[in-house]
Structure formats: C-alpha cells, structure tokens
C-alpha cells in the first residue's frame, strides 16, 4: 500500500506571483495580513499539488535585521505547525505587521493557523453581524 506523503509548501519568489495573490481573499489579523488565492484562479501552468507561501515584510517594520528576524519567525511558524492546514494548489502571502517581531511564538503559530483555515458561511455571517441586531 502506497502512502502519499504530504509535500511541504513551496516558496513564492516572483513579483508576478505576489501581485497575482494580492487580488485574492484577504484575512486580517493583529500580527499580519494573510492574502489567499487559489492557483486555478491564477491560471498557473505548473503543478498544483503543493501549497505555496510568500512573505512580505516592509521597511516600516524596521531595519534589515528586524525584517529578516520577522521573516525567519514566520517561516518557522509555517514549517512547524501549518503545513497540514494549507490547501494544495493555493498560494498564501503573509504580510507582516511590526508586532510580529515581539509576539510570543505560540501566539504567532496560533494566529497563523486560525487565519489559514477557510471560514465557513456560518462564521462569516456571525462575524459580519457585529452590532448585535
């Protein structure tokens, strides 16, 4: 019996791919913004067997040392606990906020896992009704 091993997510490196994902769904959080787009929507030629992840840390987050540290923390958070939650054939771009540098690692992983999972219709309805009516 053959077992299919789940592939780790690949990295997004090209500007065109980052721009394509930018037009997809946005999931906001206190530590980062997660942009998600299915690769079928981007008409990608390559295989859609794995998820792809890109990281964006802008200059407003600090100098190069701080930006690189944020990227390392996010990469490790994705590697440690989120490869099972990511859908194959989907691109994810994580745009970091400055608070991601000093946030506890467990909260970073928990926030990522909460944002990676797609919302159901019921959750979207509950979130949209914030005025209590």
UniProtKB/Swiss-Prot annotation:
Coiled coil found in the keyword field: no
Stretches for region Disordered: 114-133
Stretches of the chain forming a coiled coil according to its record: none
Catalytic activity as recorded in UniProt: Endonucleolytic cleavage of RNA, removing 5'-extranucleotides from tRNA precursor
GO molecular function terms noted in the UniProt entry: 3'-tRNA processing endoribonuclease activity; ribonuclease P activity; tRNA binding
EC number from the UniProt entry: 3.1.26.5
Family annotation (Gene3D superfamilies): 3.30.230.10
One annotated GO biological process: tRNA 5'-leader removal
Protein's job: RNaseP catalyzes the removal of the 5'-leader sequence from pre-tRNA to produce the mature 5'-terminus. It can also cleave other RNA substrates such as 4.5S RNA. The protein component plays an auxiliary but essential role in vivo by binding to the 5'-leader sequence and broadening the substrate specificity of the ribozyme.
Quaternary structure annotation from Swiss-Prot or TrEMBL: Consists of a catalytic RNA component (M1 or rnpB) and a protein subunit.
Official protein name in the record: Ribonuclease P protein component
Native source organism of the sequence: Bartonella henselae (strain ATCC 49882 / DSM 28221 / CCUG 30454 / Houston 1)
């Amino acid at each position: 019996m053959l077992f299919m091993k789940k592939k780790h997510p690949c990295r997004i490196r090209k500007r065109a791919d980052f721009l394509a994902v930018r037009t997809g769904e946005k999931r906001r959080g206190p530590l980062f913004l997660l942009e998600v787009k299915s690769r079928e929507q981007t008409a990608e030629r390559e295989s859609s067997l794995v998820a792809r992840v890109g990281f964006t840390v802008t200059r407003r987050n600090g100098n190069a040392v701080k930006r690189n540290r944020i990227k390392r923390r996010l990469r490790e958070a994705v590697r440690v606990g989120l490869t099972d939650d990511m859908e194959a054939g989907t691109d994810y771009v994580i745009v970091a906020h400055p608070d991601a540098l000093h946030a506890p690692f467990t909260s970073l992983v928990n926030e990522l896992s909460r944002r990676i999972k797609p919302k159901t219709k019921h959750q979207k309805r509950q979130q949209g009704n914030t005025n209590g009516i």
